[in-house]
Amino acid sequence: PSDKRLDADISPKPTIFLPSVAETNLHKTGTYLCILEKFFPDVIRVYWKDKNGNTILDSQEGDTLKTKGTYMKFSWLTVPERSMGKEHRCIVKHENNKGGADQEIFFPSIKKVATTCWQDKNDVLQLQFMSTSAYYTYLLLLLKSVIYLAIISFSLLRRTSVCCNEKRS
């Protein structure tokens, strides 16, 4: 349509999400998510492969949705525990890809990411505890500051009202 500028970048913009630690520990699977946004026109093809493989993997995708004159689509790949050590790629075919080539979005091995980030499962709990503690500490400090503000404001207002009353007498 005529509402699209010719110089505008209307190729798919990817946002990726890796499987959560909770999902991999609880369900022994991992879901990789690729969200493609701000592309035009709406004709797009998304599929998944292993990093060095040519076989198209079984994946799912949502409907193409219109958002503010452009489109968005999401696709996800759920891999079993035995495939979590592999790297994967999401391949996007769209007529406005830069250079006219397929866009390949690489996803690292979840086992590699998990072992790099967390040496021990207790590290995750420790991080959660630290985050929660920091949250409540900052909340307490904010509350303390508000109380001090109220006390100082009350004292200053009372002082000015006392000063003003003495001058009138």
Curated annotation (Swiss-Prot):
Topology relative to the membrane: Single-pass membrane protein
Side Cytoplasmic, residues: 158-169
GO CC annotations on file: external side of plasma membrane
Keywords associated with the record: Immunoglobulin domain, Membrane, Receptor, Transmembrane, Transmembrane helix
Keyword Lipoprotein found: no
Keyword Membrane: yes
InterPro entries reported for this sequence: Ig-like_dom, Ig-like_dom_sf, Ig-like_fold, Ig_C1-set, TRG_var/const_region
Stored Pfam families: C1-set (PF07654)
Subcellular location: Membrane
Disulphide linkage map: none
Spans through the membrane: 137-157
Entry-linked PANTHER family: T CELL RECEPTOR GAMMA CONSTANT 1-RELATED, T-CELL RECEPTOR GAMMA CHAIN
Name of this protein: T-cell receptor gamma chain C region DFL12
Lineage, opening ranks: Eukaryota, Metazoa, Chordata, Craniata, Vertebrata
